[in-house]
A protein has these predicted regions:
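Binding-site signature for planar aromatic cofactors or substrates
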Residues: 1-166
Length: 166
């Protein structure tokens, strides 16, 4: 967990619909708070609150899968989550010069490694399999194409905005 800069957080709502949300930060951005406790800071992103809504209104069950660049095996963690806005806890988790908006406390109930076969087959970490950025239109161009609203930003403008909004 301390080596992972990226994970996927899965939650479910009260009807059983599942949401999976990518989460990232510096390696170890999810803090190990104790033998059965993880602390995940909530950073600004797309400003959707699906995961937290599911935790508060649904079962509270969460599952994570942690990735470490270059390592094919992943770590899977399951447990029960709750959301806190404890100012002292949030102040201890400043990253990119900003405290989190909230913290997800996860009471861990299961942890296990997942074999690396899927990542090996996908060649996810191989430079040879990486796709050139120019192959895909920017997210702004895709949204413009679907809605015809506004003016589409270039990929460079999108990336510049990402950097200022981390």
């Amino acid at each position: 967990i301390g080596m992972s800069p990226f994970c996927v957080l899965a939650t479910s709502d009260s009807d059983g619909s599942v949401d999976a949300s990518p989460r990232g930060g510096n390696p170890g951005f999810i803090h190990v708070g104790g033998p059965n406790l993880l602390l995940m800071p909530d950073r600004s992103g797309n400003n959707r609150i699906d995961s937290f809504r599911n935790i508060v209104e649904g079962s509270g069950f969460v599952h994570l899968i942690f990735f470490v660049p270059g390592i094919d095996e992943t770590l899977r963690v399951g447990g029960k989550g709750n959301v806190t806005v404890d100012p002292e806890l949030m102040a201890s988790m400043v990253e990119f010069g900003k405290p989190p908006r909230a913290v997800l406390r996860i009471d861990v109930r299961e942890v296990y490694f997942h074999c690396g076969k899927a990542l090996m087959r996908s060649k996810l970490w191989s430079q040879d399999s990486h796709v050139a950025r120019s192959v895909q239109p920017s997210i702004a161009e895709v949204i413009f194409e679907q809605t015809s609203m506004g003016t589409p930003d270039t990929q460079e403008e999108v990336e510049a905005r990402y950097k200022t909004q981390l």
